[in-house]
């Protein structure tokens, strides 16, 4: 069990890695690249659909240039045009033959992008596709001192593999035509709606389980307290609840350790390191899934859940746990082996949700002070590693790690994700574990307080904290779409909503001190009530 708990905390440290993000930006507003007359386009991704000998073939993705006309966004407005190899192949000098409205396929060469485009346009080409010399895509920019940039044909850069695939087809004597367009993303994709429901539902389930466990522990404690002083001492000195309360120091240390962990991921990000993260995620996912299933099934198989068997290194384990564990292990292993398959995201989300629910049930925020410190630190952590880190690393560290840009993976596994079903660019909508888990700890605290104070849904704090969390996450997705899909730190919006709701409500109701310092309502201990001397009956007067 100690190993499982360690795995859970390892995942907890990794959970604050990524904010909500879309499947990839298609529009890049670059303020660093020079903007001069005739060279001021935004950098956009471009679909290049090919036909070989009249039959539809592969589709490639490139990036549009800073100069020239913008690529059309509608497929129906994009012309299907013949593709030809340039001669010379780099188009750094004027082509030997005139072309009549065709698109030229050229190699990167050593001359400027604008020079290639000018020679291609002068030869009568209607466009130019440049093959990059590396796998990545570069931004085709202009130099500050360039003039006479009246270029009227579009230019697109393809990565090396895609460009040479077209080059091979052309050199084999085939007839190739292409269609170039850059479709817009939908304003709202159903993936974002389902991801919002998934995140809110996870916090809801985890909060009720945490509050239910706390209520059962409290009822058991009050029952034992009534049995006498000796039992009271045993209860006070024992720690059989299995819950872990966070304090202020551990809340601060969590963010420090998470920052170190994030830097390590950024610096060491590679295929083998992602494999290690997958193993850690599977260990935590197995523990989470097993805990959730045992808790759910124990209501129907009570005898199996209350009968225990000694297992080496693990101690006493219930028969129900032994029965469920193989299924959980097989499920996690199958996901790890087949995680690149189209529907593997379902397995990842199931393991992730189970892990988050388990952590919220085990780890508790004891009062509003600790919750405020934890979420405030996470708030600045998110902002720093999404926005401020660009100044030192020239890229957003958190987004690079979350997307797995330096690996062949789709990103680190510590994410919930859903494919963007109606997005022509595909990709995933994602949310980091920390954006669910950390606010979820505060929401669970609110429900535990409500139940301990015997508050109704309307007069308590849980309903409003859930509304605040859902609203903050909703605003995150609004900001995400307004920023053209650029990754957003979700805690930037969620923390002010959730903390603000609890603090303002507590202050208005005059309960802020109890929430802040004690974390529980005033109540009289039943044992002390039992031990208080009873008032004497006055003697009867004759």
From Swiss-Prot:
The gene is SPPL5. SUPFAM superfamilies: PA domain. Residues 1-23 form the signal peptide. GO terms for molecular function: aspartic endopeptidase activity, intramembrane cleaving. Belongs to the peptidase A22B family. Keywords: Endosome, Glycoprotein, Hydrolase, Membrane, Signal, Transmembrane, Transmembrane helix. This is Signal peptide peptidase-like 5. Glycosylated. It comes from Oryza sativa subsp. japonica (Rice). InterPro entries: PA_dom_sf, PA_domain, Peptidase_A22B_SPP, Preselin/SPP. It is found in: Endosome membrane.
């Amino acid at each position: 069990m100690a190993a499982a708990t360690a795995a859970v905390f390892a995942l907890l440290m990794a959970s604050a890695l990524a904010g909500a993000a879309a499947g990839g930006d298609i529009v890049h507003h670059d303020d660093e690249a020079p903007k001069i007359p005739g060279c001021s386009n935004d950098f956009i991704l471009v679909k290049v659909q090919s036909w070989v000998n009249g039959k539809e073939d592969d589709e490639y993705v490139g990036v549009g240039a800073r100069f020239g006309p913008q690529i059309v966004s509608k497929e129906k407005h994009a012309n299907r045009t013949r593709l030809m190899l340039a001669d010379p192949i780099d188009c750094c000098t004027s082509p030997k033959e005139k072309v009549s409205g065709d698109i030229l396929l050229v190699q990167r060469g050593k001359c400027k992008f604008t020079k290639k485009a000018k020679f291609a346009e002068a030869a009568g080409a209607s466009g130019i596709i440049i093959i990059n010399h590396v796998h990545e895509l570069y931004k085709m920019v202009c130099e500050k001192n360039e003039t006479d940039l009246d270029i009227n044909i579009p230019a697109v850069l393809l990565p090396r593999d895609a460009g040479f695939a077209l080059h091979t087809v052309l050199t084999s004597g085939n007839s190739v035509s292409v269609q170039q367009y850059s479709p817009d993303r939908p304003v709202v994709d159903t993936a974002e709606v389902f991801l919002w429901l998934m995140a809110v539902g996870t916090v809801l389930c985890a909060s009720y389980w945490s509050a239910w466990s706390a209520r059962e522990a409290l009822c058991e404690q009050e029952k034992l307290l009534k049995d006498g002083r000796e039992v009271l001492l045993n209860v006070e000195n024992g720690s059989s609840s299995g819950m872990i309360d966070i304090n202020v120091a551990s809340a601060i240390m969590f963010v420090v350790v998470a920052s170190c962990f994030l830097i390590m991921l950024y610096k060491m990000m590679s295929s083998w390191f992602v494999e290690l993260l997958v193993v850690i995620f599977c260990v935590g996912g197995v523990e989470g899934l097993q805990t959730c299933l045992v808790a759910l099934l124990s209501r129907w198989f009570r005898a199996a859940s209350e009968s225990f068997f000694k297992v080496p290194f693990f101690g006493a384990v219930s028969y129900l746990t032994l029965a469920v564990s193989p299924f959980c292990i097989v499920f996690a292993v199958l996901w790890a082996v087949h995680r690149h398959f189209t529907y593997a995201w379902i397995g990842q989300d199931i393991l992730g949700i189970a892990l988050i629910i388990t952590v919220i049930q085990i780890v508790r925020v004891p009062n509003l002070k600790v919750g405020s410190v934890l979420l405030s630190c996470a708030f600045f952590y998110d902002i720093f590693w999404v926005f401020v880190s660009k100044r030192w690393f020239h890229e957003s560290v958190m987004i690079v790690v979350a997307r797995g840009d330096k690996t062949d993976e789709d990103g680190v596994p510590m994410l919930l994700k859903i494919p963007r079903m109606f997005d022509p660019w595909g990709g995933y909508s994602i949310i980091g574990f920390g954006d669910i888990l950390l606010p979820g700890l505060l929401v669970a605290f609110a429900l535990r307080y409500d139940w301990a104070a015997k508050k109704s849904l309307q007069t308590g704090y849980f309903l409003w904290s859930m509304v605040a969390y859902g609203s903050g996450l909703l605003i995150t997705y609004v900001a995400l779409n307004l920023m053209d899909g650029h990754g957003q730190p979700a805690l930037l919006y969620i923390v002010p909503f959730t903390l603000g709701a609890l603090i303002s409500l507590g202050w208005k109701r005059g309960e802020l001190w109890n929430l802040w310092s004690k974390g529980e309502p005033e109540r009289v201990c039943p044992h002390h009530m039992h031990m208080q001397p009873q008032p004497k009956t006055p003697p009867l007067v004759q």
